[in-house]
Amino acid sequence: MAERGGAGGGPGGAGGGSGQRGSGVAQSPQQPPPQQQQQQPPQQPTPPKLAQATSSSSSTSAAAASSSSSSTSTSMAVAVASGSAPPGGPGPGRTPAPVQMNLYATWEVDRSSSSCVPRLFSLTLKKLVMLKEMDKDLNSVVIAVKLQGSKRILRSNEIVLPASGLVETELQLTFSLQYPHFLKRDANKLQIMLQRRKRYKNRTILGYKTLAVGLINMAEVMQHPNEGALVLGLHSNVKDVSVPVAEIKIYSLSSQPIDHEGIKSKLSDRSPDIDNYSEEEEESFSSEQEGSDDPLHGQDLFYEDEDLRKVKKTRRKLTSTSAITRQPNIKQKFVALLKRFKVSDEVGFGLEHVSREQIREVEEDLDELYDSLEMYNPSDSGPEMEETESILSTPKPKLKPFFEGMSQSSSQTEIGSLNSKGSLGKDTTSPMELAALEKIKSTWIKNQDDSLTETDTLEITDQDMFGDASTSLVVPEKVKTPMKSSKTDLQGSASPSKVEGVHTPRQKRSTPLKERQLSKPLSERTNSSDSERSPDLGHSTQIPRKVVYDQLNQILVSDAALPENVILVNTTDWQGQYVAELLQDQRKPVVCTCSTVEVQAVLSALLTRIQRYCNCNSSMPRPVKVAAVGGQSYLSSILRFFVKSLANKTSDWLGYMRFLIIPLGSHPVAKYLGSVDSKYSSSFLDSGWRDLFSRSEPPVSEQLDVAGRVMQYVNGAATTHQLPVAEAMLTCRHKFPDEDSYQKFIPFIGVVKVGLVEDSPSTAGDGDDSPVVSLTVPSTSPPSSSGLSRDATATPPSSPSMSSALAIVGSPNSPYGDVIGLQVDYWLGHPGERRREGDKRDASSKNTLKSVFRSVQVSRLPHSGEAQLSGTMAMTVVTKEKNKKVPTIFLSKKPREKEVDSKSQVIEGISRLICSAKQQQTMLRVSIDGVEWSDIKFFQLAAQWPTHVKHFPVGLFSGSKAT
């Protein structure tokens, strides 16, 4: 802000002053106290005294600007008051001289708003009339000016009042304010306040008390300036404006535009006081109210500034010349570090040659460089250094390739890519790192023997396969078409750890500790319903195979017609491969999937074709039957994609697909469907089907008409049964101990377990759901072998927001290998529902179970045989309780302990639930719909998914029990 100054004179003399940045200067007459005016002879004019400018918002006082003022405040405005002392006190028959002050201020204007313009306001006050006694022992007042809605105040010196009660005081006060004028809202009201110093037990304290307030509409002043005499009434009660307690006579009132050219010329002149600005000037004190000040200087001029930090930020951007000379060869250090990152074109970019010691060396050098920059640079603007981008220049905005950056959606993170583990997306990768990744990807592609080129003809286009950005796959930029490769090729081609090595040093040196989480892969921090490293299927670096495209081309023939049904088969085990082979022999519409990436690619292509059909036809499409042949974890991957994809679509899309569940192995959802549909039960839940797919090897000869049963279900499913979708929120421990925990939101329709999730028989039911796919490396969290770290910031909230079924995992620290200490807080959904044990509980309050549990299981499925949906969950807990020691009689042996007893409880009608370990350092393993998630600090369950996708449509036969 430019310098402002002013001078003014009165009848009795002249005075002047000038203000500089960061201080306010005022000259005012020093009048004797009232009790001395009648006793002392006239005195010579006293020398002018410096005043103060204070900040009302933060009560911050900075560097002294004169010898008599104890402290002055740093501010965007400059205030000057001038005047001359009267020749003497008012003797008998003499009219007291008017109180003379010229007050200047420049208030900051929000230049980012087009409707806010700076204007200059001029106000001259001639007389103060006290109509009522406003306070006892009132001997001095202050006239303050403030914009309504702002905390910045410009105050005059204290005006000493005679002790005669109701008085008239002659004034010669001039206020000149540069203020922000808003053109499009009614926020231009100027408050003229009559204030006095606060007192406590006859002692002056910091702060001011407002006695009366008057309002001036600046919009009217701008349109109709006034040079005549006006009377402004001041009211002690804003609601009662009919009776003023004081009046101020105004001589002139105007609002004028600012000369922008003059301001620009002043702004271009960098005065020396900017370079001399020092951090030592910031000595602050606090007060109770706006307008605080040192109580020893009650006669000073006060100025308040709320935006003090903004001023300091703009000033500190100008680096001190003297400070620059002290920097020890910063440029040389910087160039030397850049050379260490230079990539040699002849050798190529081989990350395998970069050791951890070299990376750590570079990190330490960069940390030392940044420390030296902060040490020798007086700038304290934190955000300038807290950048998530590279230290190189930010690239110009441009359109990204279609496949790049697609997984940045908060809900689409389960799709794997080269960028999915330990690497950053396009948005958080520097140009240097992008060049390294390009070389990695190019060498990786060259090593693939059967890789396809862009000239290969595929009827399924990229848009068909991956849909829009919210449902797209993230694959390497140069890989436009799927590659035909085995699992070993995918695992051994581009190691994620190599890619991760490129980004780790950059993250640690260019981002603060709290912000590093934002630059991590979405799989480690997302709040979505999916994960890039999904624990149930495949690896994160996989992309759809060519066979998936070929099978889709045979099913999705044209845009004019939609297929009646699509059969998705999980071929990661022999059961799925066996069923797929039988169906393919009969030329059924089968798509074999081996990973979550392929599942989502098929469903995304199907949604895209449905969208094209709706665009080309006026009639609504009939539901497409999507059969899911696999275990519970396979259905969970389909459910997560369904919930996430349809969250951004209208409710009509909920009826465009109908899912058919064909179980291979244990499946709690299929077990429930069999209880409401007898024909479904006879097809997939009989002993023949169960015995066939529970074997370890496929049968030599076909003992069962598997394809016939599947197609009978596909063709005969004419009824839709809506299964409620519940929500589970997992609070997971981060891979790095110093990082904050992160949350994951997962939809489910079946059972969640905490406890025994191995393949051993379960304590409840018939061992529902051990995952079909190996879950030794869960996708949400770091390995269980990493050190346990206590995170005090991640504690269970007061109320949960999700629901599911739980299972408890054995803890090595537990007194028993198969139990764990848990605390389960739950809320009942309906007062009428109560626990089967018959205990009375308040349904509206929290209920707590704190014990050593063998298993905890929460189910969202309705009761067996009930087709009517319920809005609550049911929890089954099995606790282990050790009885007290029983002393033995007539024997000298130690008291023996009775065997541990198990106690089972079933609690129904639960709407919300929170489960956490008794010890914060204990991490949980949770199985949700057959998918295991590790390193869970605590989790919450709610009976309903929060979006409009609240049900999962499942097709059944037209049996009597189906709805």
UniProtKB/Swiss-Prot annotation:
- Report if keyword Kinase is assigned: no
Cited Pfam families: C2_PACS_N, Pacs-1
Q: Which stretches are tagged as biased composition: Acidic residues?
A: 276-293
A Gene Ontology biological process annotation? Answer: protein localization to Golgi apparatus
The lineage is: Eukaryota, Metazoa, Chordata, Craniata, Vertebrata
Q: What positions belong to coiled-coil segments?
A: 353-377
Which family is this sequence assigned to? Belongs to the PACS family.
The function of this protein is: Coat protein that is involved in the localization of trans-Golgi network (TGN) membrane proteins that contain acidic cluster sorting motifs. Controls the endosome-to-Golgi trafficking of furin and mannose-6-phosphate receptor by connecting the acidic-cluster-containing cytoplasmic domain of these molecules with the adapter-protein complex-1 (AP-1) of endosomal clathrin-coated membrane pits. Involved in HIV-1 nef-mediated removal of MHC-I from the cell surface to the TGN. Required for normal ER Ca2+ handling in lymphocytes.
Q: Report residue spans for region: Disordered.
A: 1-72, 78-97, 262-299, 377-428, 476-542, 760-804
Q: Which residues carry this modification: Phosphotyrosine?
A: 251
Cellular location of this protein? Answer: Golgi apparatus, trans-Golgi network
Residue list for modification Phosphoserine:
28, 379, 381, 430, 495, 519, 528-529, 531, 534
What are the UniProt keywords, alphabetically? Acetylation, Coiled coil, Disease variant, Golgi apparatus, Host-virus interaction, Intellectual disability, Phosphoprotein
Q: Give the protein name, as stated in the record.
A: Phosphofurin acidic cluster sorting protein 1
Comp. bias intervals (Polar residues): 406-428, 483-496
Gene that encodes it: PACS1
Q: Which GO terms describe its molecular function?
A: transmembrane transporter binding
What does the record note on quaternary structure? Associates with AP-1 and AP-3 but not with AP-2 complexes. Interacts with FURIN. Forms a ternary complex with FURIN and AP-1. Interacts with NPHP1; the interaction is dependent of NPHP1 phosphorylation by CK2. Interacts with PKD2 (via acidic region). Interacts with SORL1. Interacts with WDR37. (Microbial infection) Interacts with HIV-1 Nef.
Sites where Phosphothreonine occurs are at 46, 504
What residues bear N-acetylalanine in this entry?
2
Q: Which segments show compositional bias classed as Basic and acidic residues?
A: 262-273
Comp. bias intervals (Low complexity): 53-72, 770-804
Illness: Schuurs-Hoeijmakers syndrome: An autosomal dominant intellectual developmental disorder characterized by intellectual disability in combination with distinct craniofacial features and genital abnormalities.
Q: Where is this region: Involved in binding to AP-1?
A: 168-175
Q: Where is the composition biased (Gly residues)?
A: 1-22
Q: Per the record, what is one GO cellular component?
A: Golgi apparatus
